[in-house]
Design a protein with these regions (language model features):
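Hydrophilic extracytoplasmic domains
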Residues: 193, 197-236
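N-terminal low-complexity, Pro/Thr/Ser-rich intrinsically disordered segments
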Residues: 21-45, 118
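Bacterial N-terminal signal peptides
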Residues: 5-15
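N-terminal glycine/threonine-rich, aromatic-flanked beta-hairpin/loop signature
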Residues: 127-182, 212-222
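SH3/SH3-like beta-barrel superfamily modules
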Residues: 22-33, 61-104
């Protein structure tokens, strides 16, 4: 059985939530935040570690049942003591994301690609960001996200909230910050801490993941693009 399937089964048994947006929004991220890609290199399964209520500690009570296996790739958000906070997102069709703590000794950095490969369809559930070549060496970014689509009553009553963007960018490197709703119709690099009605997004390419964080103004109520997306097959 694949590692992501094992993890999904374990987390279901534990009652862990499937996050609609597992990433924090831009306003909550610390200055200089830079997620990185790392790989499980431990010789045995790396169990998640509890934090809080007397944990972490070298006890069974502080060890989660859920685990990852050698070769699994995670997004590292930060470090606390001997542990790192990570996000693991499985593949299609569920794209289940899990956020938790792992022993730092179980991970090793993955070298960044020499040339960022932005082009592709990046998905998490029904939400997606599609990136395609555009004239002049730029890239077209199209995104769609929703909230409430899993509630049949909301669907029947038209109560599903949505968000979308469509813009053209020329990223330099493996991250980009932009506002698709800038007044002049052109993408702009904005300070996410500035109070603005404009939608602001920041993307980090950590292949096979695309990490996104927005300022909470990119769609209807509760809609967010703040998530971890994985490469997915292109829509026919």
């Amino acid at each position: 059985m694949r590692a992501c399937a094992l993890l999904s089964l374990l987390l279901t048994a534990l009652g862990a939530p499937a996050f609609a947006g597992v990433m924090d929004g831009l306003d909550s991220l610390p200055a200089g935040f830079a997620p990185r890609l790392e790989k499980i290199v431990a010789a045995k399964p790396a169990h998640f570690v509890k934090h809080g209520d007397g944990c972490p500690a070298a006890t069974d009570a502080c060890t989660e049942k859920a685990y990852l296996v050698p070769g699994d790739l995670v997004i590292v958000l930060g470090t606390q003591g001997d542990d790192v906070e990570v996000i693991f997102t499985g593949g299609a069709p569920r794209f289940r994301s899990t956020r938790g703590w792992l022993p730092r000794s179980a991970l090793a950095p993955v070298p960044a690609a020499a040339t960022p490969a932005w082009v592709g369809r990046w998905a998490n559930g029904d939400d997606f960001i599609a990136i395609t070549p555009a004239p002049g060496g730029s890239l077209a970014f199209v995104g769609s996200a929703s909230w409430g689509g899993g509630d049949p009553a909301r669907v029947a009553n038209g109560g599903v909230n949505v968000g979308a963007f469509d813009t053209t960018l020329a990223p330099r490197g493996a991250s980009v910050t932009f506002s698709p709703s800038a007044d002049d119709g052109k993408p702009a690099t904005l300070d996410p801490k500035v109070d603005s009605d404009d939608c602001v997004l920041r993307l980090w390419l950590l292949d096979p993941y695309l990490v996104a964080a927005d300022n909470g103004k990119c769609g209807g109520m509760n809609v967010t693009f703040s998530n971890v997306y994985r490469r997915a097959p292109a829509k026919p």
